[in-house]
């Protein structure tokens, strides 16, 4: 902060009394900002001089777009996509995230294969433009997350409100990554497992209810079935997490094993299951909404089967 105030005295700074994490920091800071569009930008992101133009034009000319983002490149290997964002993200049926340009540990070079403007499931919070009115209507980022996966949850909620998340490929930014927690941190692993479950709990039932209504079910029946289906899906995800935890233990990583255990414990403490009545009311008010970018099945299994050919199949696999 001292450097900012000294080197860039014309920039307004907002000081918080403590570290509220990625989520709480943005939520509290943006309360004091009056603008039509918010730009969420990490301190470890390098941007070109003309990067804002395509973003602002997209937001001005496309009212259906609630948020948009550039292609996120690796600062270390500037022609390769960055792990946590790449050219826009998807999730599979269990909530595991992956990207155009990054699946599991496989990362592509940017050869122009994603130079089309595309609507995706989520975009990286490292560099994300959001309509301020929509950000406030949705209550901002979920403060329970602290950090990690909050942008996926936000983009999911944004789509449920009927807005699109769009990648604007005319510009690229370069992200160092790992600024909050290093990749090897057990705390990072814990947050990822915990927040993935919170994200599913926030959004699955409402998504299922809208799908069931479009399939011809009345809203009351759709809400009941959606809530039960969401609970079963989350239980399945927790079972998969348990298998992963056992694998960590067998490999001798007690810290990773305990990270999963703590993640599930914190999820039970922080989680809030939506009521059937709330899900029904939401489905009645959002019958036209559609969530794009959720792949049926498991990205892990599909990647094991297809290897690097999985990148050629992403458009057909993700609805």
Predicted regions, residues:
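Short aromatic/hydrophobic "clamp" motif used to bind/position activated sugar donors
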Residues: 38
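A short, conserved alpha-helix in the catalytic core of glycosyltransferases
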Residues: 115-172
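Glycine-rich, basic loop-to-helix element that forms the pyrophosphate-binding segment
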Residues: 15-33, 43-45, 54
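Active-site-adjacent helix/loop segment of glycosyltransferases
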Residues: 161-280, 298
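Short, flexible, basic/aromatic active-site loop/helix in glycosyltransferases
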Residues: 89-120
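Acidic donor-binding segment of Leloir-type glycosyltransferases
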Residues: 1-15
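Conserved donor NDP-sugar-binding/catalytic core segment of glycosyltransferases
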Residues: 46-96
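Short alpha-helix within the catalytic core of nucleotide-sugar-dependent glycosyltransferases
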Residues: 1-2, 27, 35, 49-60, ...
